[in-house]
């Protein structure tokens, strides 16, 4: 008993002792000040990092992804704990910065090679997405060996990915998408064996994807869209068994779709659109049981509908548009019970309208336009309410009326039935009144009776967009116009090519109208003044009518952004009220009869105006200075402008197109324009430019036309070295395949001498390149560096004084379609290498001093004989072939040109002159003696003193 008491007492004493120590320690903790987590060297690194960039405008991409921009770094200061700063996360125990999230922080700056971010050694997450960072990724990233997530997407980073990226072996997520990276993907990326996410879309990568990418066995997302990858798709990707998303759209892949993709059994999303794939969809796709989205649009795929897809019952989106598929659509496509969107437009599908598609209850979007479907439009028995919201079946071979059963598609929001042969029956617009959700209706180019705009608009109470282009539309103005508020809410109205003669007065009450196209009609008179008072009107296309002027509005609304008035009969000065349209982005008044000078009041537009086209008018005077600083495109060709190019043009940093052709500009070559980093088209044709052009650095230039001026001198040997956009260096710069210069509502155009004739480029492809130096006084040799321009399509050096040989380096111009070196002083042989240019369809070597064998090859056999005339020393079977219809010389005769024929005629003339020379000289001497002896007044007056005066007068001028 006593022992138990001793043990209990000991336990109590020990317990009390521990309790006392705990209380004392806890008191010390309460009494001690709060410990700061942030380590000093970490704070110092972050503050230095903050000073490497500036706070600018929010990135517009943030709204696109639903993230609100916030200036996170404004909370960073010396007097606060860096672990509490916005975007900064620290390790709770060590105080080391482990995460840095600066996405959507409105930041602007460059990535420095000695960036202080390299001192954040324990950083695991770095997110600088959706800002305005630029420059190259530097080696400072290599120090961040603990990184597991790196996101630099949606910036302006450029250059190549360093091979050392493979050293970041802990990375699980790497997103570099939507930047300006270029070059090839380094094979070292295959060392990132823990990657689950790899995003490289929207850059300028080219070449082939390294096979080492097949080592990324944990990868679930691979985004490579919007680059210039080409060649064979690596079969090693077929081993990425965990891949769920594969994005390969907008590249330059060709050949057949690799069957190895069928091995990716976990694939959910597969995007292969906008490439050059051909053949059929592989049967191995039948293994993709998890696939929900498939997009193979804009390729060259063919064959019948791919039945292999019918087993993939999880498919919700299928896009086969813009291919070469044929045959009929199978009725058992209804087995795809989860199908929500089916796009098969612009193929060659045949048969009748596949009304069985309406059986699929989930179907929401259906696009079948641009096929060869025929028969009457029959929608079948639509018994249950349809979920269909989008239906486009235009541009087929359907005949007959629009069926009344369409009114049962009560959820329809967009409907396109253009190019329907209604057999001249009137359209019953009342059937559309049942479609309460209808927002967009396209009924262009119907073979129907006249549509009365005044009668049909009341049927559309909620319609936002209506396209009646290509129909015969009556817009007769009623005697009285109601002043009641409009019941319609149309925002976009397309009436192009409708035969309208008077401006539709009914539009006066359409206060919601924002987009109006009345181009290609016969509207006469003046543009009504009330049009400028519509509060929401931002786009107005008046082009190709017979307007003669503008009624001046009392007070124009400032909303107008696009004003297109080309090809009318406008006269007088450019209206001053246009200067009040301060939101104007595009102004096209080309092909009219405007006169006077360019209004100086246009200075009011300089902050927004991006595209100005005043070509083909009668404008005179000089160029105003400093009024178009934001311009992307300036075209004032075919006017009567004088003086020099304004030097203020060198400050137009956004300028891509400058066209001043056919004016009276007298100036030297504008070398100073080389400071414009975005300049792509330069046209100085048919002016009075003069002097040498020497070395001109235009790395972005795609088209240059300086023809028919007075330029002289020789071109340096290395003249074209820096013209990288026309060389192979510039081949892969753009992320998209086919694009045009211009904006969404306006495309640039120009006239260019191509293949011996003037050709109008209604739209300018961004991949189109041309050099025209013709009609000047250039001399010396053609620079060998011309051979660097491997992307060149048109080369015209004619009508100059070039000497020497045609450089064999022209044989490197594998994209060349047109070559003209005529009317020079070139000698030697035509280079055999030119015969290897498979795309060359036009060439002109005439009127030089060329000799030797004309190269063989199909390109030479398709030329005209006149392309070789004026070169006495040319011979060969190719020449005999192209000139056989002109004459057939004997085998021992030299090739005779029109020039030699003229020389023969001259010889005959001299022989005839010699025959008459003897009697003529005797008669002349006798007649002269009589005149000199008697000096008659009638002879001396007209041929003596007056003649001397005439000579002096002529010399003075």
UniProtKB/Swiss-Prot annotation:
* LRR repeat copies, ranges: 120-143, 144-167, 168-192, 194-216, 217-240, 241-264, 266-287, 288-312, 313-336, 338-360, 361-384, 386-409, 412-434, 435-459, 460-483, 487-510, 511-534, 535-557, 558-580, 581-605, 606-630, 632-652, 653-675, 677-698, 699-722, 765-789, 790-813, 815-837, 839-862
Q: Which residues cross the membrane?
A: 911-931
One CC-aspect GO term: plasma membrane
Main location as per UniProt? membrane
Cytoplasmic side, ranges: 932-957
Among InterPro entries, the record links this protein to: Leu-rich_rpt (IPR001611), Leu-rich_rpt_typical-subtyp (IPR003591), LRR_dom_sf (IPR032675), LRR_N_plant-typ (IPR013210), LRR_R13L4/SHOC2-like (IPR055414), RLP23-like (IPR046956)
Extracellular topological intervals? 32-910
Q: Which UniProt keywords apply?
A: Cell membrane, Glycoprotein, Leucine-rich repeat, Membrane, Receptor, Repeat, Signal, Transmembrane, Transmembrane helix
Q: Does the keyword Transmembrane apply?
A: yes
Does the record carry Cell membrane as a key word?
Answer: yes
Q: From the UniProt annotation, give the residues forming the signal peptide.
A: 1-31
According to the record, glycans are attached at 78, 101, 114, 143, 167, 191, 215, 242, 263, 311, 332, 381, 477, 541, 544, 569, 593, 608, 618, 712, 796, 812, 836, 844
Return the SUPFAM superfamilies for the record: L domain-like
Compartments in which it is found: Cell membrane
| Membrane topology of this protein | Single-pass type I membrane protein
- Belongs to which family? Belongs to the RLP family.
What is the protein name stated in its UniProt record? Receptor-like protein 34
Origin species: Arabidopsis thaliana
What gene name is listed for this protein?
RLP34
């Amino acid at each position: 008993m006593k022992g138990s008491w001793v043990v209990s007492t000991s336990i109590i004493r020990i317990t009390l002792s521990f309790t006392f120590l705990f209380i004392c320690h806890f008191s010390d903790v309460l009494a001690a000040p709060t410990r700061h987590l942030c380590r000093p060297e970490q704070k110092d690194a972050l503050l230095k990092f903050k000073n490497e960039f500036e706070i600018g405008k929010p990135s517009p991409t943030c709204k696109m992804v639903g993230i609100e921009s916030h200036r996170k770094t404004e909370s960073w200061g010396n007097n606060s704990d860096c672990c509490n700063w916005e975007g900064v996360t620290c390790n709770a125990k060590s105080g080391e910065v482990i995460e840095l999230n600066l996405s959507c922080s409105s930041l602007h700056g460059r990535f420095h090679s000695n960036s202080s971010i390299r001192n954040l050694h324990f950083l695991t997450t770095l997110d600088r997405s959706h800002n305005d960072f630029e420059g190259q990724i530097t080696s400072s990233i290599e120090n961040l060996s603990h990184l597991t997530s790196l996101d630099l997407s949606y910036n302006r980073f450029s250059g190549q990915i360093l091979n050392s990226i493979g050293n970041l072996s802990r990375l699980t997520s790497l997103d570099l998408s939507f930047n300006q990276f270029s070059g090839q993907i380094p094979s070292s990326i295959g060392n990132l064996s823990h990657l689950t996410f790899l995003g490289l879309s929207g850059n300028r990568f080219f070449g082939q994807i390294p096979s080492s990418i097949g080592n990324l066995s944990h990868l679930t997302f691979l985004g490579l869209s919007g680059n210039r990858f080409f060649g064979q798709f690596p079969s090693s990707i077929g081993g990425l068994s965990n891949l769920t998303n594969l994005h390969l759209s907008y590249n330059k892949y060709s050949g057949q779709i690799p069957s190895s993709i069928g091995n990716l059994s976990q694939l959910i999303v597969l995007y292969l659109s906008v490439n050059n794939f051909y053949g059929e969809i592989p049967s191995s796709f039948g293994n993709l049981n998890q696939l929900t989205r498939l997009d193979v649009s804009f390729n060259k795929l063919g064959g019948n509908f791919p039945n292999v897809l019918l087993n993939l019952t999880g498919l919700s989106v299928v896009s086969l548009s813009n291919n070469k598929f044929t045959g009929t659509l199978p009725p058992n496509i209804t087995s795809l019970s989860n199908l929500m969107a089916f796009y098969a437009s612009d193929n060659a599908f045949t048969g009748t309208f596949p009304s069985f598609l309406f059986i699929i209850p989930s179907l929401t979007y259906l696009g079948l336009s641009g096929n060869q479907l025929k028969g009457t439009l029959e929608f079948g028995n639509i018994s249950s309410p349809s979920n269909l919201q989008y239906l486009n079946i235009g541009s087929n071979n359907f005949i007959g009326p629009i069926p009344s059963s369409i009114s049962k598609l009560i959820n329809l929001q967009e409907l396109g039935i253009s190019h329907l042969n209604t057999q001249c029956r009137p359209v019953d617009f009342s059937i559309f009144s049942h479609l309460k959700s209808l927002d967009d209706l396209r009924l262009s180019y119907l073979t129907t009776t006249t549509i009365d705009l005044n009668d049909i608009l009341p049927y559309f109470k909620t319609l936002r967009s209506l396209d009646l282009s290509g129909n015969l539309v009556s817009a007769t103005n009623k005697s009285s116009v109601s002043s009641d508020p409009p019941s319609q809410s149309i925002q976009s109205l397309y009436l192009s090519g409708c035969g309208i003669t008077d401006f539709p007065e009914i539009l006066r009450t359409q206060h919601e109208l924002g987009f109006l196209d009345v181009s290609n009609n016969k509207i006469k008179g003046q543009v009504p003044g009330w049009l400028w008072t519509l509060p929401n009107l931002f786009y107005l296309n008046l082009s190709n009518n017979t307007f003669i002027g503008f009624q001046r509005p009392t007070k124009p609304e400032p909303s107008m952004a696009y004003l297109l008035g080309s090809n009318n009969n406008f006269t007088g000065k450019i209206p001053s009220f246009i200067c009040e349209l301060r939101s104007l982005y595009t102004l096209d008044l080309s092909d009219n009869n405007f006169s006077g000078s360019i209004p100086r009041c246009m200075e009011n537009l300089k902050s927004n105006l991006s595209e100005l086209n005043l070509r083909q008018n009668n404008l005179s005077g000089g160029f105003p200075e400093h009024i178009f600083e934001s311009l992307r495109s300036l075209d004032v060709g075919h006017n009567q402008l004088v003086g020099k190019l304004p030097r203020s043009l060198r400050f137009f940093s956004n300028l891509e197109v400058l066209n001043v052709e056919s004016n009276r500009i007298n100036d030297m070559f504008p070398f100073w324009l080389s400071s414009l980093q975005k300049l792509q088209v330069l046209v100085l044709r048919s002016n009075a430019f003069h002097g040498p052009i020497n070395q001109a650095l235009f790395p972005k230039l795609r088209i240059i036309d300086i023809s028919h001026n007075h330029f002289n001198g020789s071109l340096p040997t290395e003249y074209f070295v820096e013209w990288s956009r026309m060389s192979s260096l510039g081949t892969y710069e753009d992320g998209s395949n086919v694009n045009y210069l211009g904006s969404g509502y306006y495309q640039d155009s120009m006239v260019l001498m191509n293949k011996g004739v003037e050709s109008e480029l209604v739209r300018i492809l961004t991949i189109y390149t041309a050099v025209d130096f013709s009609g000047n006084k250039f001399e010396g040799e053609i620079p060998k560096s011309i051979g660097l321009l491997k992307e060149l399509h048109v080369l015209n050096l004619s009508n100059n004084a070039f000497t020497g040989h045609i450089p064999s380096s022209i044989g490197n111009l594998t994209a060349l379609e047109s070559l003209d070196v005529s009317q020079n002083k070139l000698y030697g042989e035509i280079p055999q290498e030119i015969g290897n240019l498979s795309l060359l369809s036009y060439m002109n070597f005439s009127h030089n001093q060329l000799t030797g064998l004309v190269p063989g090859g199909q390109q030479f056999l398709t030329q005209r004989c006149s392309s070789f005339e004026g070169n006495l020393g040319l011979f060969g079977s190719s020449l005999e072939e192209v000139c056989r219809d002109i004459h057939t010389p004997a085998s021992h005769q030299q090739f005779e040109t029109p020039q030699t024929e003229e020389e023969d005629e001259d010889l005959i003339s001299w022989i005839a002159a010699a025959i008459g020379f003897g009697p003529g000289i005797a008669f002349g001497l006798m007649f002269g003696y009589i005149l000199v002896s008697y000096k008659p007044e009638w002879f001396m007056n007209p041929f003596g003193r007056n003649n001397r005066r005439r000579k002096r007068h002529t010399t003075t001028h």
